[in-house]
Amino acid sequence: MSRIAYFGPVGTFTEQAARTFMAAGDELVAAETIPKALDAVRRGEADAACVPVENSVEGAVPATLDSLAVGEPLIGVAEALLPVHFSVLTRDDVGEIRTVASHPHALAQVRKWLEDNLPGARVVAAGSTAAAAVAVQAGEFDAAVTAPVAVEHYPLKVLATEVADVRDARTRFLLMRRPPVVLPEPTGADRTSIVAAAANRTGTLAELLTELATRGINLTRLDARPHKQNFGEYRFFIDFEGHVAEPRIADALAALRRRCRDVRFLGSFARADGVAATIEPAARNEDFTDAADWVAAVQRGEQA
C-alpha cells in the first residue's frame, strides 16, 4: 500500500490525476501546496507525490519546476494527461455574481468566458481550484472556477460546466518518488526529463541542445527558470523522447553531465499520449551498440 500526496484539497484536477496512479489499497493525502506535496515524499510521510508539470495553454507550472530543481532529488516514474475543462460553482443564496475565484492557471484558461458571461465580476486568485470552492462555500466569494469533480465534494450548485476558452486543453501530471526507485521498463514511447544548471557563458544552451540533436533525439519541452541565488543564471528543464535504458539516451545524458555543472535526472517513463519516439537514420539503439562494439574491438587491437 502506498500513500500518494497530491496538490489539494479534494476536488482538484491533481486529485483526479492522482487517482489514475492508484493501485488497490493506496491512499491519497492532500497537501496544501505543490512544494508541500513533494516535501512529504522527501520526509518519508508519503511514498509518492502527484503534481502538475505543464498545461497546453499556460505552459509550465513554475511551482513544480522550482521545487524539483532544489532539495532532495526526486524521480518521476509515470505521467498522466488530463483534458481540462471547468465548472463554475456558486451558492444557492447568491444572486448577482460579483467575485469569481480560482487558481491563476484556471482563470487564464477561462478569461474569455468570464468576460463574455460575467463581465462585471471581479476575478480573484486562489491557491487552487478546490480552495476557491471552499472559499465560496464559506461566503468569501460568489463563484469559483473548479474542476468538474469539485461539485461532488462541496455543497455548491453548478452555474456552468464544460467551460474552457481552448477546447482541447490538457494538463500533464507527474508521479514523483524518492530514490532509489525501480525505473519503468522502456516501451518505445517514452519521455526522459532532466534539469540542467549550465555555465553562464555564450553558447551554453546551444551546446546542450546539440548533444541531443547529434544523437537524433527529439526535444519535447524546454523551459528556463531563474536560478534564484545567482541573478542572470538559469536552470533549463528539458524533456526529450526516449528512455535512459537506451544507449543513445544514456550517451546523451553522459555528454550533458560533462558539459553542465549540475544535471538532475527527473525520470524516464512511458508517455501518457503513447506517441512513439521519432528516430532518425543512424540514431537507432543498434547503431549506437554496433559503434560501441567496433570501438571496443579497435581498442583490443582486433579491428582496423
UniProtKB/Swiss-Prot annotation:
Protein name: Prephenate dehydratase
One GO cellular component, as annotated: cytoplasm
Reactions mediated catalytically: prephenate + H(+) = 3-phenylpyruvate + CO2 + H2O
Domain Prephenate dehydratase per the UniProt entry, residue ranges: 3-178
EC number: 4.2.1.51
Domain ACT as annotated: residue spans: 193-271
Pathway stated in the Swiss-Prot or TrEMBL entry: Amino-acid biosynthesis; L-phenylalanine biosynthesis; phenylpyruvate from prephenate: step 1/1
Originating gene: pheA
Entry-linked PROSITE patterns: ACT, PREPHENATE_DEHYDR_1, PREPHENATE_DEHYDR_3
Source organism of the structure: Amycolatopsis methanolica
MF-aspect GO terms: prephenate dehydratase activity
